[in-house]
C-alpha cells in the first residue's frame, strides 16, 4: 500500500494531510497560515514607490519593483511550506505527494520545489479547494488518487520483505 502526502493550499493558508491508502480518509498533519495574505497590499508596505536618480541631469523617476509586496509575501509563504514539506519528506520514507492549489499558485509551488520533491509529485489538482469541508475535500482527493494509474504509484512503493515466516 502506498501512503500519500496531500498539500492543499491557497495564498492565505496551507494544510498538509496524510492519506494512508487510496481508499482511506485524509488525516491532518500540519497547518500553515500566511497573515500577510489576508491584508491589503497598502497595509504591507509604504504607499509610494522608491525614487531613482537619472544618470545625468537632475531628473528623478519612480522605481517600480519587479514583484509587488503581496507577491513577495506569497513567495515567502510558499518557501516556508516547502521547507516543512521537505522536513516531512525526510521522515516519511518517500511518500508520493499530491498538490492541490489554484493554477497560478501551483505554478509558484512548481517553481520553488527542489528536484527531490518534484520527483515525488504524483498528482496535481488545479483547483482552490481550501474552503471545502473536509468530507468533500476527502472525496475530491481520493477521486484524483484513484484515477492515477498503478504504474505511477508503484514507483513509490516500499518493497516488502520476503523471508522465512
Range-by-range predicted roles:
Residues 1-165:
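Terminal alpha-helical anchor/extension segments at protein ends
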Amino acid at each position: 500500500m502506498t501512503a500519500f502526502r496531500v498539500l492543499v493550499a491557497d495564498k492565505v493558508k496551507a494544510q498538509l494531510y496524510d492519506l494512508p491508502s487510496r481508499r482511506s480518509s485524509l488525516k491532518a498533519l500540519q497547518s500553515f497560515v500566511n497573515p500577510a495574505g489576508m491584508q491589503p497590499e497598502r497595509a504591507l508596505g509604504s504607499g509610494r514607490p522608491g525614487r531613482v536618480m537619472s544618470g545625468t541631469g537632475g531628473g528623478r523617476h519612480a522605481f517600480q519593483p519587479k514583484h509587488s509586496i503581496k507577491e513577495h509575501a506569497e513567495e515567502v509563504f510558499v518557501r516556508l511550506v516547502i521547507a516543512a514539506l521537505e522536513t516531512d519528506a525526510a521522515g516519511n520514507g518517500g511518500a508520493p505527494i499530491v498538490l492541490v492549489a489554484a493554477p497560478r499558485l501551483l505554478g509558484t509551488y512548481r517553481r520553488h520545489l527542489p528536484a527531490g520533491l518534484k520527483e515525488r509529485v504524483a498528482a496535481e489538482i488545479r483547483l482552490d479547494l481550501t474552503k471545502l469541508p473536509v468530507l468533500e475535500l476527502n472525496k475530491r482527493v481520493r477521486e484524483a488518487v484513484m484515477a492515477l494509474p498503478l504504474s505511477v504509484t508503484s514507483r513509490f512503493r516500499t518493497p516488502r520483505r520476503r523471508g522465512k515466516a
